[in-house]
């Protein structure tokens, strides 16, 4: 699922839960979508961190 649609659906289910409540199926869907979102974010952070290189600093005497 596209990230924008994923976030829109998560937000829709959140608002619906506050206004009228969710069915059992919608609660399961909400949990699944939230987990998918978290996994995507964690994957993105991991990729970014793997691309980071440590730059050695020269030894300084103060």
UniProtKB/Swiss-Prot annotation:
InterPro entries noted in UniProt: DUF896 (IPR009242)
Protein's UniProt keywords contain Cytoplasm: yes
Q: Which domain of life is it from?
A: Bacteria
- Gene3D superfamilies from the UniProt entry: Helix hairpin bin (1.10.287.540)
**Entry keyword Cytoplasm:** yes
**Cellular component aspect of the GO annotation:** cytoplasm
Per UniProt, subcellular location reads as:
Cytoplasm
**Key words of the record:** Cytoplasm
Q: Which HAMAP family match?
A: UPF0291
**Would you identify the family this protein belongs to, as annotated?**
Belongs to the UPF0291 family.
Put simply, this protein is called UPF0291 protein CLD_1956
